[in-house]
Amino acid sequence: MARAFPLERVRNIGIAAHIDAGKTTCTERILFYSGVVHKMGEVHDGAAVTDWMAQERERGITITAAAISTTWDDHRINIIDTPGHVDFTIEVERSMRVLDGVIAVFCAVGGVQPQSETVWRQADRYSVPRMVFVNKMDRTGADFLKVHGQIKDRLKANAVPIQLPIGAENDLKGIIDLVENKAYIYKDDLGKDIEQTEVPSDMVDLVSDWRLKLMESIAETEEELLEAFLENGELTIEQLKSGIREGVLKHGLVPMLCGSAFKNKGVQLLLDAVVNYLPAPVDVPPIQGLLPNGKEAVRPSDDGAPFSALAFKVMADPYGKLTFVRMYSGVLEKGSYVLNSTKDAKERISRLIILKADDREEVDELRAGDLGAVLGLKNTTTGDTLCASEEAIVLETLYIPEPVISVAVEPKTKSDMEKLGKALTSLSEEDPTFRVSTDQETNQTVIAGMGELHLEILVDRMLREFKVEANIGAPQVSYRETIRASSSGEGKFARQTGGKGQYGHVVIEVEPGEPGTGFEFVNKIVGGSVPKEYIKPAESGMRETCESGVIAGYPLIDVKVTLVDGSYHDVDSSEMAFKIAGSMAFKDGIKKCNPVLLEPMMKVEVEVPEDFLGSIIGDLSSRRGQVEGQSIEDGQSKVQSKVPLAEMFGYATQLRSMTQGRGIFSMEFSTYEEVPRNVAEAIISKNQGNS
């Protein structure tokens, strides 16, 4: 079957931003103007096409990244609308991993917010080219050039306006295209009757200044363009367009556009810019991966190359499990068998689907550059590689952050107990930041996630989708343990109870590991003092002990263990004996390494009227917060701080009462830091009292 669109005319893009910047409304307008939907859905009415979960429609926020295909100007555009709430950061993360370009949406009033910085960093991590759409230009306080300054200062991006608004707030009449040097005046509320005209006389000087700045920025990206600019004093429209595109692809510049998605202004011009400036799959570097022999290899974006794809999302569906895939190379056909190279498992492709939010179109094949979904995969989870069996490769996977908060879940009845297991399995398959474990002491089921809202949504889904009635405990902070010193440890397990005994003996060295390494094991046994077959069990005993720590029962992180010596018995030694000896040696060593407790620190930004600044800073300090910066603009104060998560429960209610409902805040995970001794002692004694 021939391609519907050549690869050069495919765009895989994401729409990402801070919560409430207007991403979903922006996506809705794109679908309306490109003909996918014939009636505009509004987020505040709970009718947005991309918000298809019940919770999304109720809360007016996007939780899961909905993938939609549409067309514009003879191009296929695959769009992922990502959530802006920090608790759903994995949805943004996995979207960035499979996209070729991003539209970063900013509110013309709020500008750069903390979550904007997080999304920007995620796009940086995967080197995703991007453009900026400054939305909500119709709102009171909208200021396009202020947002331009914030993007340059706070995000350190070379933001270059390629448009200017004509008017602002209630007086937003249209948009200036700096590339074409034309004005677009909107004549109706639907944004379909647009008059193209000359630049208004009162804006000629301003437009001339910004057009010159645009030319200078583009001339700096390429020597040929610089010569043309110096020779002629300006660049042609074609040179401007090719220069912007080249600058975007090389991450040299970020074009800035503006409009109001809600008021239907600027969306068609945004679609034109997506087609003109964001990359096709063939414009980005080919995906890298590892061959079975450990050598690096690449897969070009080409139908003729061996098939490879990345599973970037798994979702429960009334018809079975839906696995979203980004096709990187080759062709995937319905009914074929492929290899899951991450798990070394064969998979059958039952059905292939292209999605339009909760609408779907069955297809016979997916090709390089496509975003689609597969029905019927048994073993594939988020981050797995699918490839041709005879041309195996494992692609770079996803970065998955650790959960920071947990709650105990107790089913109300026996039938709820049976349904709970199924619900938790299904939800954890969908969301890798959602973890399920059993508390060894209480035998309770514990679920962990990225924040209170994250767990609230998941518990809500258990009730709605899986009909599980459960009691939910109070939120608990996910503390960690680590060590600050080095030492050695020894474990000898010897039992003689008639007949065959048990014997295992290991000696280890323990030291702090590099941040982010978790548990690192090195085998330095020489001369066979511990036979090869007992090394893995000894390591396993240490890893298991790591899971429950040594001072307060929390997982131990960033520890390096080196196995240096030991002994065995020809008859009595066994894998179990060495597993126990490994655990004993680990506990012995860790206790001598100055173990400490770590807690998740949150980056908290609070925005309040100036009058409340003093009480806000005082309150943050009382919560063990460290104020890292503050600013005052138009009577509004912004305070940036780092606060322990343990001190932030119930903060929304407290902030409302302190500011008479006029304060807002955002919070995201920053890092793990050592808990002060007096606080740590209370946590440790509480945990030891419970054990």
From Swiss-Prot:
Location in the cell: Cytoplasm
Top-level taxon: Bacteria
Keywords noted in UniProt: Cytoplasm, Elongation factor, GTP-binding, Nucleotide-binding, Protein biosynthesis
GO molecular function, one term: translation elongation factor activity
InterPro entries for this protein: EFG_II, EFG_III, EFG_III/V, EFG_IV, EFG_V, EFG_V-like, EFTu-like_2, G_TR_CS
Main location: cytoplasm
GO cellular component, one term: cytoplasm
Binding residues for GTP: 17-24, 81-85, 135-138
Alphabetical GO biological process terms: ribosome disassembly
Domain tr-type G: 8-282
PANTHER family: RIBOSOME-RELEASING FACTOR 2, MITOCHONDRIAL, TRANSLATION ELONGATION FACTOR G-RELATED
Entry function: Catalyzes the GTP-dependent ribosomal translocation step during translation elongation. During this step, the ribosome changes from the pre-translocational (PRE) to the post-translocational (POST) state as the newly formed A-site-bound peptidyl-tRNA and P-site-bound deacylated tRNA move to the P and E sites, respectively. Catalyzes the coordinated movement of the two tRNA molecules, the mRNA and conformational changes in the ribosome.
Family annotation (NCBIfam families): EF-G (TIGR00484), PRK12740.1-3 (NF009379), PRK12740.1-5 (NF009381), small_GTP (TIGR00231)
Family: Belongs to the TRAFAC class translation factor GTPase superfamily. Classic translation factor GTPase family. EF-G/EF-2 subfamily.
Official protein name in the record: Elongation factor G
Organism this protein belongs to: Prochlorococcus marinus (strain NATL1A)
